[in-house]
From Swiss-Prot:
Disulfide bonds: none
Keyword tags: ATP-binding, Cell membrane, Glycoprotein, Kinase, Leucine-rich repeat, Membrane, Nucleotide-binding, Receptor, Repeat, Serine/threonine-protein kinase, Signal, Transferase, Transmembrane, Transmembrane helix
Catalysed conversion reaction: L-seryl-[protein] + ATP = O-phospho-L-seryl-[protein] + ADP + H(+); L-threonyl-[protein] + ATP = O-phospho-L-threonyl-[protein] + ADP + H(+)
Organism of this sequence: Arabidopsis thaliana (Mouse-ear cress)
Name of the protein this chain belongs to: Probable LRR receptor-like serine/threonine-protein kinase At1g63430
Gene Ontology CC: plasma membrane
Xref: InterPro entries: Kinase-like_dom_sf (IPR011009), Leu-rich_rpt (IPR001611), LRR_dom_sf (IPR032675), LRR_N_plant-typ (IPR013210), Prot_kinase_dom (IPR000719), Ser-Thr/Tyr_kinase_cat_dom (IPR001245)
Length: 664
């Protein structure tokens, strides 16, 4: 009798602990499954998830409800984590925001995401996800923002998207999605998004949708009437019938239609069967066995607590381990870095609130790296802007980083040339911690997008020559006319933005990498003993990589002429491929982009000559390049031997028909 009583008591206590710990046994377990699916975490952002006794609400990227009983937000963006999306994420049913933007997530989007009925923001953009968009996303009845841009998603849009009547932002650009966005209904005004065998009326979706981007996929058909209020750039780079859009080439569209979409081997059947087996297994257990398991589990838990107490005791008595590159908050307060207050007196300072309004709550992301995010926005006066936001935490910000940030702002503010992006201002705030740069926005996208994602034929030979000379003039200005000189951190076609009339603008969006690298290099100069660290007048200035810029310009010239990227998995490096054409003048025409109908042989020879001179330099050693042509000489060669008459006419008009008329 007594044993039965104790068993019942143990059962009641066990059930009490289980019910009190419902948060831990459900949502925390799902978070741990997500952590297990991440196999690389180079920045150690999830390192504090490993402590079994820590509060999940204190884990990096986890935000809980005010009562701390549910997870309502997961934000681990731009953290370089590699892995899969665990299906168990669908068990965190109180989740309102799932933001995993800018990582290296692979595999498919699990259908279990559709279980998150409270989700308002789903941001999986800029990853390596594949396969179709699961139809279960249509079950996210309260969703307001979906961002799946810049992945490898395939298939057609699921018809169930028509159920999302509160969706106001949809970003699915830069994937490999196919199918039609619209089939006109009987009235001519109803729009339908088609899945494989069904369609759904998205009239409600059209009413709610304020921002959308379908560009650079393989969609066909026409733009839905209810989406005609969106910018035309939201549909460019597809295979649609609208003549006023920049389309993919006919060969790309034809190939896309021939390729059958085979999703990655889905693990759903196996996963589903495993769930059914587990469910059956649980249902078949007798009650006495369940009670025994609870008692055993409690005893194991007690032993774990004793072991944990012992480990904590030993940890508190451990010898101190000093990590040289980490400083505690108390150590950070021991020194101060004095910065010249006059340094930024002539540069406009904008508030975070101003930029938040201009960039629509920082939702319009146009670029991302491990160090920064780039947003597009519009100021009150109507000026379009590109805002670079540094991805760094306040506790990681040092006096040296602050100095380098201000020097970078002052350096960029010096630039004033037709072929360099203009810095409009900066943002610096403490709460929330913010460091941003604000540039004028070139509305025609990057050179890389035009050459490799858009309709390359629209960038005719005349326009390409105009871009070549514009880049050369920009580099000449930066290297030769500025005092002190200025170099682009990573010169590539992604760093060349184009205006409506195809004027190139050199932009240094990768300057953060230089700032962080130089800060770490100088960190050893900070004395932990002294109370003040005064920066010497001779402190190193902006790192000048003139030879690297000129070498990169040579690669750019080949990329512009050929339409090929610097590296392609199937065809290798552009430089290696181009060698045979550069060394044999009679075969030089083989370099030219096949998308071009016309080109000028003399211009081609000039560009190839300059490219060869650039590539013959040593990009790692400025001292070995004294006898090589300077950027001024290279620019003069291009300007004197390439006719600018066509480019001059094109400059007065940004319409494509003007160029076509000149070509004919």
């Amino acid at each position: 009798m007594r044993s039965k009583y104790f068993c019942s008591l143990a059962l009641v206590l066990g059930l009490f602990f289980v019910s009190c710990d419902g948060f831990a046994s459900n949502e925390v377990q799902a978070l741990r499954r997500f952590k297990e699916a991440i196999y690389e975490d180079p920045l150690l952002v999830m390192s504090n998830w490993n402590d079994p006794n820590s509060d999940p609400c204190d884990w990096t990227g986890i935000y809980c409800s005010p009562s701390k009983d549910h997870v309502i937000k997961i934000n681990i963006s731009a953290s370089s984590i590699k892995g899969f999306l665990a299906p168990e994420l669908g068990q965190i049913t109180y989740l309102q925001e799932l933001i995993l933007h800018g990582n290296i997530l692979i595999g498919t989007i699990p259908k279990e995401i559709g279980n998150l009925k409270n989700l308002k923001i789903l941001d999986l953009g800029n990853n390596h996800l594949m396969g179709p968009i699961p139809a279960e996303i249509g079950s996210l009845s309260g969703i307001m923002i979906i961002n799946l841009q810049s992945n490898g998603l395939t298939g057609k849009l699921p018809a169930e998207l028509g159920n999302l009547k509160y969706l106001r932002e949809l970003h699915i650009d830069r994937n490999r999605l196919q199918g039609s966005l619209l089939v006109a209904g009987a009235s001519g005004y109803q729009s339908k998004v088609y899945s494989s065998n069904s369609s759904a009326n998205i009239a409600g979706l059209c009413k709610s949708l304020k921002v959308a981007d379908f560009s650079y996929n393989f969609f066909v058909g026409n733009i839905p009437k209810c989406l005609e209020n969106l910018p035309r750039t939201s549909f460019q780079g597809n295979c649609m019938q609208n003549k006023d859009l920049k389309h993919r080439s006919s060969s790309q569209c034809a190939n896309a239609q021939l390729v059958k979409t085979h999703g990655s081997p889905s693990a759903a059947p196996k996963h589903q069967s495993a769930q059914m087996v587990a469910k059956h297994h649980r249902a078949s257990k007798p009650k006495w066995l369940l009670a025994l398991e609870i008692v055993t589990g409690s005893m194991v838990g007690l032993l774990l607590l004793v072991a944990l107490f012992s480990a904590v005791h030993r940890w508190n008595n451990r010898s101190t381990l000093i990590i040289p590159w980490k400083k505690s908050s108390s150590e950070k307060e021991k020194f101060t870095v004095y910065v010249d207050s006059e340094m930024l007196k002539d540069v406009s300072r904008l508030t975070r609130q101003e930029l938040e309004v201009a960039c629509e709550d920082f939702s319009n992301i146009i670029g991302l790296s491990a160090d920064s995010q780039i947003y597009k926005g519009t100021l009150k006066g109507g000026s379009e802007i590109a805002v670079i936001s540094l991805c760094v935490k306040e506790e990681d910000w040092t006096g040296y980083l602050e100095l380098y940030f201000q020097r970078e702002v002052a350096d960029l503010a010096r630039l004033n040339h037709e072929n360099t992006a203009k810095l409009l201002g900066y943002c610096k705030e403490i709460s929330p911690f913010t460091r941003m740069l604000v540039f004028e926005y070139a509305s025609n996208g990057t050179l890389y997008e035009h050459l490799h994602y858009g309709e390359a034929a629209l960038v005719s030979w005349a326009r390409r020559m105009k871009i070549v000379i514009g880049i050369a003039r920009g580099l000449k200005y930066l290297h030769m006319e500025l005092d002190p000189p200025f170099t682009i951190s990573e010169l590539s076609s992604n760093a060349i933005y184009l205006t409506e009339d195809f004027t190139p603008k050199l932009v240094d969006f990768e300057c953060w990498k230089t700032i962080l690298a130089r800060s770490e290099k100088n960190l050893r100069n900070i004395s932990s003993q002294g109370s003040i660290c005064v920066l010497p007048n001779g402190m190193e200035s902006r790192y000048l990589d003139v030879s690297g810029n000129i070498y990169a310009f040579g690669i750019l010239l080949l990329e512009i002429v050929s339409g090929r990227p610097p590296y392609c998995k199937d065809k290798g490096f552009l430089i290696e491929w181009a060698k045979e054409f550069l060394e044999a003048p009679e075969a030089m025409s083989g370099l030219v982009d096949p998308e071009l109908k016309h080109f000028n042989q003399e211009d081609l020879e000039t560009v190839c000559e300059v490219a060869s001179q650039c590539l013959n330099r040593d990009p790692t050693n400025n001292n070995n390049n004294h006898n090589k042509p300077s950027v001024q000489e290279l620019c003069e060669t291009l300007e004197s031997r390439i006719s600018l008459s066509i480019s001059a006419e094109l400059r007065s008009s940004s319409l494509a028909w003007a160029e076509l008329a000149l070509d004919s």
